[in-house]
From Swiss-Prot:
Intrachain disulfide bonds: none
Gene Ontology cellular-component annotations: cytoplasm
Single annotated GO MF: 4-amino-4-deoxychorismate synthase activity
Listed GO biological process terms: 4-aminobenzoate biosynthetic process; antibiotic biosynthetic process; folic acid-containing compound biosynthetic process; L-tryptophan biosynthetic process
Family: In the C-terminal section; belongs to the anthranilate synthase component I family.
Protein name: Aminodeoxychorismate synthase
SUPFAM superfamilies reported in the protein's UniProt record: ADC synthase, Class I glutamine amidotransferase-like
Domain named Glutamine amidotransferase type-1: residues: 5-199
Pathway per the UniProt entry: Antibiotic biosynthesis
Reaction equations catalysed: chorismate + L-glutamine = 4-amino-4-deoxychorismate + L-glutamate
Description of the deletion phenotype: Disruption of the gene abolishes pristinamycin I biosynthesis.
Species this chain originates from: Streptomyces pristinaespiralis
Length: 719
């Protein structure tokens, strides 16, 4: 069959690239995506360039010019076959003379069974059909030229077709991971478009289906003829596996910056390795980034500092390409490289706005040239150091460090487990909330109003807690990893600030082989008092419609983000709505994977997905604007990403949640939750406080000034 050329108008939605991927599979060619305000590209296009048009979903109302943009022109000026999805469907109907009004209830990330007429888009598709809906508005009073082709059981209009032209609209989202027969529907649209143009559609009844869920292959060993770069990796396996806590202090206590990427909760397939290191050798660097300045500052091992214009993403992309070093045959892919964080305000470089100024750098990384790696599964440990062929003295320096570090580890005694003090020995915390609890509740209500008006589907709202006074960060981290062990825990120490994280959520892992994986979390419940109650809580979470809708919205958003940078047909969801259990909570987790296109760098892939959708909501761009307005301040490190970019081409970053950021003046904590149409404001306040428990408990172990128990503190905060 010949390929079909589709123009896909993007109404700034976070699901457009799910349509992109499906259309590319069905059509045999990737569609051209044009944003609804990209008039320059639009002016260079003509109807003859395409076989059909798809108008994407999006936030807002189709009568609002800025919400619809070029979608209005393509609907009114072009006579090509057209499919409108959600907002596109509403626009098609409105411009034909229908009314668009509030639906009986907002319906986002939830499924419905619809009945259809079996014709046109619905040919050879069973009825009833299960579909996912994301809408607060609905179409009423269809004009004579449009006919209804699908409804829900309660009579809500779900699809239309023009009586004389190949024009169709669907209120639901055929591209959602939980909608049935989406590929068949788009294939039907392809065939209808070809017929309209006088072409014979394909005879085969076989419809391209989503790619199977292939297991990521192990990274291939580099060939003997692999190009030789500037850097050399020096590796030495140590005879004994040291205690991570003791080794961190013994090897890196004097480093100006240091990291502990800590699998404090070892999970097969999730967390096997712990990495401890620093920019402690002659090749080490410290990097800070300020969005407003749009420049990276690099401080080298000798203390010299340079300013390099451009974004942090640009800097990482350039330097990783220049410093590439193939994987070494070790069981892990982190063969040294960049370790640090991307603060939430870095969103200004990935589609968001530069709305707020924080006290700390918007991004901070260290180029680590010294490291200890621990394999918790095999019980092995390695020391790693870098040298440069351009600086011959760095090779013997690396070997000396390996020898000295191995000798140090051989005589380092394990540190005793951290002992948590009882409540009656702890002073009380002076917790300052950016938004009081009544005000936070009002913000939840405002989010629900925005959802009702169709401006957004889900808002991940945040509150910031500040505890004045200085703490010992390492003591607080030891308490945190004891209270709340997590697979993506981390301790990052930079001059002026230390990040202590017990994150359970993977933002994005990219293997050296190019396979990417994200594991968004949406849905949280406190653990039950006993085994029976705990099992009941877990089962309740797994079945809860509100939590599943939150999770599904973010899964579809992450699929969209990966769909921008991954091979056609490679994005898939091997795990949907799985409950993971932690020390204090159960959480609803899904897994999304895809294979990066060959020309996509790791920083570019991270940039496409940043900030993580589980910390913004959807649609991402519009919702971030509302977050800027509602929260009235920076999030800082919180809700950004933390982890490493390896010289091997691998990267692994967590979502910054369950995290303390400590400075000389105070410790700050970010907490919040996803607000959807089904949210109860009081429940959202309780969830926010629940998520603060572990970090506040750790602060109480390290901070001078606490008295009340965590339960009393939380109860008092609710009053």
């Amino acid at each position: 069959m010949r390929t079909v050329r589709t123009l896909l108008i993007d109404n700034y939605d976070s699901f457009t690239y799910n349509l992109f991927q499906m259309l590319a599979e069905v059509n045999g060619a990737a569609p051209l995506v044009v944003r609804n305000d990209d008039t320059r590209t639009w002016q260079a296009l003509a109807p003859g360039d395409f076989d059909n048009v798809v108008v994407s979903p999006g936030p807002g109302h189709p009568a609002t010019d800025t919400d619809l943009g070029l979608s209005r022109r393509v609907i009114t000026e072009w006579d090509l076959p057209l499919l409108g999805v959600c907002l596109g469907h509403q626009a098609l109907c409105l411009l034909a003379g229908a009314a668009v009004v509030h639906a009986p209830e907002p319906f986002h990330g939830r499924t419905s069974d619809i009945r259809h007429d079996g014709q046109g888009l619905f040919a050879n598709i069973p009825s009833p059909l299960t579909v996912v809906r994301y809408h607060s508005l609905t179409v009423r009073q269809l004009p004579a030229d449009l006919r209804a082709t699908a409804h829900t059981a309660d009579g809500q209009l779900m699809a239309v077709a023009h009586r004389h032209l190949p024009r169709f609209g669907v209120q639901f989202h055929p591209e959602s991971i939980s909608s049935e027969h989406g590929h068949r529907m788009l294939a039907n649209f392809r065939d209808l478009s070809l017929r309209a143009a006088g072409h014979r559609p394909p005879h085969t009844e076989r419809i391209p289906a989503p790619a199977p869920a292939p297991a990521p292959a192990p990274a291939p060993a580099p060939p003997a003829s692999a190009p030789v770069g500037e850097y050399r990796l020096h590796v030495r396996e140590v005879a004994c596996v040291p205690d991570a806590d003791a080794a961190f202090t013994a090897l890196f206590a004097d480093a100006p910056a240091r990291f502990w990427l800590d699998s404090s909760r070892v999970e097969p397939g999730l967390a096997r390795f712990t990495f401890l290191g620093a920019p402690a050798g002659p090749l080490g660097e410290q990097i800070t980034y300020d969005v407003a300045d749009r420049a990276v500052r690099v401080k080298d091992g000798s203390g010299g500092e340079t300013r390099r214009p451009g974004t942090l993403f640009d800097h990482l992309e350039h330097e990783l390409a220049a410093r590439a070093l193939p994987a070494t045959g070790l069981p892990f892919e982190f063969n040294l490289g960049y370790v640090g964080y991307l603060g939430y305000e870095t969103k200004a470089d990935s589609g968001g706005e530069d709305a707020h100024r924080g006290e700390l750098p918007d991004g901070a990384f260290m180029f680590a040239d010294r490291m200890l790696a621990l394999d918790h599964e095999q019980g092995r440990a390695w020391l790693l150091a870098l040298s440069s062929t351009r600086r011959p003295a760095t090779a013997p320096a690396a070997e000396r460090w390996l020898t000295d570090a191995a000798r140090t580890l051989a005589t380092t005694a394990p540190r005793p487990p951290f002992t948590l003090l009882p409540d009656d020995q702890l002073p009380a915390l002076d917790v300052h909330y950016r938004h009081s609890l009544p005000r936070y509740r009002e913000l939840v209500e405002e989010c629900r109003r925005l959802i009702t008006d169709g401006e957004t589907y889900e808002v991940c709202l945040t509150n910031m807690l500040r505890v004045p006074g200085r703490i010992d960060p390492l003591t607080a981290y030891r308490a945190l990893r004891t209270v709340s062990p997590a697979p993506y825990a981390a301790y990052l120490q930079f001059p002026g600030a230390t990040v202590l994280s017990s994150s359970p959520e993977r933002f994005l892992r990219i293997g050296a082989d190019g396979w990417a994986e994200s594991k968004p979390i949406k849905g949280t419940r406190p653990r039950g008092a006993g085994p029976a109650q705990d099992a009941a809580v877990k089962a309740s979470l797994a079945a809860a419609e509100k939590d599943r809708s939150e999770n599904l919205m973010i899964v579809d958003l992450v699929r969209n983000d990966l769909g921008q940078v991954c091979d056609i047909g490679s994005v898939h969801v091997p795990g949907l709505f799985e409950v993971e259990t932690y020390a204090t909570v159960h959480q609803l987790v899904s897994t999304v994977r895809g294979r990066l296109a060959a020309d996509v760098s790791r920083p570019r892939a991270v940039r496409a997905a940043f900030p993580g959708g589980s910390m913004t909501g959807a649609p991402k761009v519009r919702t971030m604007q509302f977050i800027d307005r509602l929260e009235k301040g920076p999030r800082g490190v919180y809700s950004g990403a933390l982890g490493y970019f390896a010289l091997s081409g691998a990267a692994d970053l967590s979502i910054v949640i369950r995290t303390i950021v400590a400075t000389e003046e105070a410790a700050t904590i970010g907490v919040g939750g996803a607000v959807v149409a089904l949210s109860d404001p009081d429940d959202e306040v309780r969830e926010m406080l629940l998520k603060a428990q572990t970090t506040l408990a750790a602060l109480r172990q390290a901070h001078a000034g606490a008295t009340a128990s965590d339960r009393e503190l939380l109860a008092g905060s609710l009053r």
